[in-house]
Amino acid sequence: DRRQRQMCIRDRIRTAPEYLKALKVKSQIPEIKFYSDEETVSLIVKERKSLSRFGDGEFMWMSGESMVSFQDYSAEFASDLTSAFKSDNENLLVGIPHGVFDSSKCNLYAKMHWRIIRANFLSRLVKFMDVNRVYSDASITRPYIDYRDRNYSAKIFDLLKRIWDKRDVVIVEGEKTKLGMGNDLFDNATSIKRIICPAENAYSKLEAIKSSIRLNVEKDTLILGALGPTASILASQLCDEGYQFVDIGHVDVEYMWYLRHAILRETIEGKYVNESGVKTCSDVYDNDSSYINSIIDRVLS
């Protein structure tokens, strides 16, 4: 709407000086190896690998920095993130944002964002990275709003749908996330169940969430996590226990934006979209029978 467009324009104007400053920073970009998105999905589908994703926020926390966010900082939280990132479990794929190294497919605003991240955060990323490791692209679950080509977005969404094709799925999500409600994203899954977790500070319930999964989820079931940085940790720790956990992040929001031909990170009725700048959402899906019947546990208090 008009208000969101105005907010977006103001944000881009505010970003411009930081971007111009970032252009002057000559970053030494290391040679980091990446799986293609096709290779990542193939490994998840054929070899049942898990995926843990890390962005600039996770690297800030790992570096000991707190920030205004939906997740409070603690030393234990940072330690668990770092352990997940450095995991040597061969069944765990670790994702980092490919845009930091190559943003050629991105739109102008995303290119500005990644250039700023490269200038300000690359040194922090590098100290955690293993140049001998092959990483996945953490942005594989965000194939729309930052990209110029809708055909590319359509291709990646079709690719992602292979992950849960004909699989029994348990979604571990925040209580306002409601993955798949209002769209057909998961229609090709055999079944969808949910474990509902806190929308904010989910890490405080980490052990309770793991206990719920152990109690309610069979190990041949695919777990999809949409729980911020807590999902990054869960992917690693549950992979160590023999589960397949894919940190799927913002995929549902990105898909809704794609269906709407959105040009901004706009609100979506009935879903909490933290990037829209709006902290509330309607209860449009709260009494939906398909949503209610899919819930197998709530880990909230």
List each language-model region with its residue ranges.
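Residues at the starts of beta-strands that form the adenosine-phosphate
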Residues: 167-168, 191, 244
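A mid-sequence, solvent-exposed acidic-amphipathic segment
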Residues: 176-220
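Glycine-rich beta-strand-to-loop/alpha-helix junction loops that act as flexible
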Residues: 226-228
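Single conserved hydrophobic/aromatic residue that forms the stacking wall/gate
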Residues: 1-11
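C-terminal functional extensions of proteins
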Residues: 230-301
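Electropositive, gly/pro-rich neighborhoods at or near active sites that engage anionic ligands
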Residues: 10-187, 300
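Structural motif
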Residues: 168, 221-222
